[in-house]
Curated annotation (Swiss-Prot):
The lineage of its organism: Eukaryota, Viridiplantae, Streptophyta, Embryophyta, Tracheophyta. The keyword Metal-binding does not apply. Keywords: Chloroplast, mRNA processing, Plastid, Repeat, Ribonucleoprotein, RNA-binding, Transit peptide. Residues 1-57 form a transit peptide. Its main location: plastid. InterPro entries: Euk_RNA-bind_prot (IPR050502), Nucleotide-bd_a/b_plait_sf (IPR012677), RBD_domain_sf (IPR035979), RRM2_NsCP33-like (IPR048289), RRM_dom (IPR000504). CDD domains: RRM2_NsCP33_like. SUPFAM superfamilies: RNA-binding domain, RBD. This is 28 kDa ribonucleoprotein, chloroplastic. Residues 97-175, 191-269 form the RRM domain. Pfam families: RRM_1 (PF00076). It is found in: Plastid, Chloroplast.
Amino acid sequence: MATNGCLISLPPFFTTTKSISSYPFLSTQLKPISLSSSLPTLLSLNKRTTQFPTFVSVLSEDDNTLVLDDQEQGGDFPSFVGEAGETEEYQEPSEDAKLFVGNLPYDIDSEGLAQLFQQAGVVEIAEVIYNRETDRSRGFGFVTMSTVEEADKAVELYSQYDLNGRLLTVNKAAPRGSRPERAPRTFQPTYRIYVGNIPWDIDDARLEQVFSEHGKVVSARVVFDRESGRSRGFGFVTMSSEAEMSEAIANLDGQTLDGRTIRVNAAEERPRRNTY
């Protein structure tokens, strides 16, 4: 018994080459693009899969044909590389773009420091240094700008900048493993006060608060033991003028602070050691 049937010739679903005109989104002026031969593609022509290709392995410019790789996709998507296998990597800022920022107000955190220096350029890193024992700011930090030029601009803008009543010290941080060259010393009068017999729980911020009632405080520092991290019971305060220093000494020497009688007098400069 004969059976009825018809012969239909179906075109192959995929071909190894196709005219570039069928892909209007590709320009005939494109340069050849070569992916690494070790990287798999998304399509295997041998298996007649219905998955559409995502990556083009070779774009031929001579005959305007689009050639698909015949390897099967496996694993993660490949990463693109340029000519000669070059990859774009992040470059760390120069050490010359790192700044030391001293005499910071104690309520300024790293975020506030970064926001301040954004006026000079792009801030890569901003860090306020804290005491490990008390978790309080030590009054200084570091800022790394994006370029050396921006770092120079930041020094110009913020050196001796008045931030909440304190004059900032801003200069280039010394590169790791090297000692900064010391500038020639010039004599500048400092109105520094020694404060003794202070209570053990007094920190820099409280000491500054006490002396700020008698003038502008440039800096205030309680001396802590390096090993234990506890106060050694004395500190130093620098006022902005001789008159304010004299007023603070006259009003605070012999006064009681949290149950202890404090000693307040002009600090003596340490004698310089002779070098041979």
